[in-house]
A protein has these predicted regions:
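Acidic, metal/ion-coordinating pockets
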Residues: 1-253
């Protein structure tokens, strides 16, 4: 089976654009399941019920998030009610779930969301936490969205889960890396999938806003520029009988 994983969606305009392109991407890559990181899909940061529904109605099967999961209080009920919108599992005992198991009929796919420790909000140890979760999952097809800042921590998680999960996909930094590989002949890996956001921007945010923040030291409201939008993603080919990743392809369009 082929699984599409789309990097952090930044802002509503980027979400709209992604949804307009998803049908063709799915056809071109024969996609069976689509996972989207939507933690910044709302204008002004975070995720809202509106931006989440936009992605789900536009073709996402599962939405993962990250350190901005709870930036918007209006999402709390949706985290509780939804089986396909997840937040980092090691983010404490709070609203929602840290993993889901998606029933595709012929097989099931588990998706785990984890938050890194380095340079991030306080959270439980993701290495210890993922061990607990894996004991609860009874499918070999397992995708891990590791939302983390440090490359070293992401690489370590890749090796830690080598042979135990189908893929470890880094998110959060919004810059697609050039190190996709299959670890141990089993686990697809990339340090960062990248983002879906404005090309002429600073990590999806209006460049003038970020420059003003860095030169004046005053807080700035995040706004999102108009113009061309890029989509960063990966497509995983997985043997659904044993969960082994046989190919990982980057998308940068």
């Amino acid at each position: 089976m082929n699984i599409l994983f789309v990097g952090d969606v930044v802002g509503q305009t980027s979400g709209d654009y992604l949804c307009s392109r998803l049908p063709k991407i799915k056809r071109d890559y024969s996609v069976d399941l689509t996972i989207v990181n939507g933690e910044n899909s709302a204008d002004g940061n975070g995720i809202t019920p509106f931006s989440a529904n936009l992605l789900l109605n536009g073709g996402a099967d599962i939405i993962t998030t990250g350190n901005h999961s709870f930036r918007r209080r209006e999402m709390n009920d949706m985290y509780e009610e939804s089986d396909v919108i997840i937040r980092p599992a090691n983010f404490g005992d709070t609203y929602g779930k840290g993993y889901c198991v998606f029933d595709m009929g012929r097989t099931r796919v588990a998706v785990i969301n984890l938050l890194g420790m380095a340079y991030m909000d306080n959270c439980d140890n993701p290495f210890h936490f993922v061990d607990k979760i894996l004991k609860e999952i009874d499918t070999p097809n397992i995708i891990v969205d590791f939302h983390a800042e440090a490359t070293s921590e992401k690489k370590a998680m890749g090796y830690y889960l080598e042979g135990r999960v189908s893929a470890v996909l880094g998110t959060h930094t919004h810059v697609q890396t050039n190190d996709e590989e299959i670890l141990g002949g089993h686990t697809g890996y990339i340090t960062d999938v990248g983002m879906t956001g404005a090309k002429r921007s600073v990590l999806g945010v209006d460049k003038d806003v970020i420059i003003a923040r860095l030169t004046t030291y005053y807080p700035q409201k995040h706004t999102y520029p108009e113009g061309d939008i890029m989509i960063n993603a990966v497509v995983l080919s997985i043997d659904e009988k044993n969960g082994r990743c046989t190919e990982i392809k980057k998308i940068n369009m």
